[in-house]
Amino acid sequence: MKSFYHLTQFVFITFLFTIFRLIGFKNSSNIGFFLGKTLGPIFRSKSSVIQNLKKANINGDFEKITSNVFGNYGRIFAEYVHLKNFKNDKLSKYISIEGKEYLDQIKKNKKKVIFVSGHFNNFELMAMQIEKQGINCAAIYRPLNNPYLNKVMEKMRKRHICKKQ
């Protein structure tokens, strides 16, 4: 039964990826944000997000923050099919790098460093940009629970984000 569920999920996600590829980056990103805000709480535990916000001593409107968290995940999901365009600089206007001089120093001195990122905006782009700067990079990736989707995502990550996963 789990295999059927994974296959159905795979077909649905592949369909969405096809739509996102056809409608372009900006539309995909905006629709992904809307879908994430709308559907995210159905597929993920909204209460665990709120509990984590409380543990982190985040103040504010938990409902709004949670809604934006799900929206952000939806946006990242929808942008996956456009990673190739980030890699080949067709979407570089959406990326800003603060502290590029540190990357230049790391490359020049061949220092070994560890970069830490959170799930802020499209967090996948960090490893891509580090690798594009000519720095030998490896990324840690938790495999998806769906083996069909994981195979596709791993291929996309290796091709467009960072060769070493």
Give each language-model segment a name.
Residues 1-117, 150-155:
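Membrane-anchoring hydrophobic helices of lipid-metabolizing enzymes
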Residues 111-165:
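Catalytic core of membrane glycerolipid acyltransferases/transacylases, capturing the structured
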